[in-house]
Amino acid sequence: MKNIILVIGLSLSCHINFAQDWVQLEDYPGLGRNHPITFSIGTDGYVLAGQNENGTYVKDFYKYDTTTDSWTQLPNFPGYPRGYAYGIAHNGKAYVGFGTSNVFDIGPLDDLWEYDPVSETWTELASCPCGGRLHPAMLEAGGQIFVGLGNNNSGNLDDWWAYDLATDAWAQKADFIAEERHHPYFFSIDDIAYVGFGHGNDIYNDFYKYEPLTDTWTQVASLPAEGRVAGTQFSYNGKGYALSGDGDDHYYLETGEFWQYTPETDSWMSLPVHPGHSKWAPGCFVVGDVLYFTSGLQYDDGNSETLNDLWRFNLDEISSIEIVALETLVYPNPTTDKILLSSPVDYRLFSLKGELVLEGNGASIEVSQLSKGVYFLNTKSKTYKIIKE
């Protein structure tokens, strides 16, 4: 069966409308948590630390064997328990650090640790002279670990640092060129770093690439949707992915949005959403052609739950797609003044009683004059439920 995508706008992005299963797997045995540190080495995925459902920062450590669908608890991380921290894997080892801890009120952390899965041992490496921080971007590109942005007790940050694995030394690089922010999305593709979205004076949808060889930043295509923060991300097969998180009101998205970035075309494509509303501060890891998605806080019918779940999504199925029709993306929703569309379309807006209240053609619809309530926006291909606040 062919998968189908709908092209949005002038080939700047596209949207998949086929149903593809997210499969739920075995929960890990620890308490649910937000901000887990997640990574994969070989056929195993790892979940470490985070903030549990009781609001406590933890240091427990779990390994998931993808060949047997089973979890094993490993010895605790030897550093401080922490949340708002990150980790990456490179050349068969993992590197984790930063975040914050409630032990002795030490606040933002600047440490870096290496994990060897063969010996199951941790080694503390050189701390970053950048100072401690929560919610940074952390990725590997060109054999170096890059860390930057985030926030500390002084506010949001825009600095950028490189760690050299061979010399165990840090060097400051060119600052991020946009607004200071924390909790950005980030990944690397072909030794180039990509960083964006996140929360500063606003919640952003802009995106940037950093080239280590020239130490330069360049803005690339923004996400063709509302700004977002506190999701998870990864790269796979030459593309980058942004999954879940909060929207531009720092509240959950109605669906668990999943986006793919292609650097060759500088474009975004929407993929099948994960079950339920979006998650705040989940984690993920990739083994082979499979994405594993875990943890985070999720809302359902007004209630929230901090999860220890695990879901699987087959990434190789994304490659078989067929472009068939023009579609549009509508945001923000709810709205107070305007409805923005990702491309100009003919539209009609109806009240809940079925009365036509607006019609026209364009990519922006002024609705500030309308009463609060529920409306239905009809385009040639779809009808959207719109909430006017």
What are the residue ranges of the model-derived segments?
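Bacterial Sec-dependent N-terminal signal peptides
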Residues: M1-D21, F376, T383
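N-terminal cationic leader/targeting segments used for protein routing and processing
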Residues: N3-I4, F18, G92, G238, ...
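A broadly conserved detector of short glycine/acidic/proline-rich loop/turn motifs that flank catalytic sites
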Residues: L10, D246, L297, V345, ...
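Kelch-like beta-propeller repeat domains
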Residues: A19-I318
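C-terminal outer-membrane/trafficking sorting elements
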Residues: E322-E389
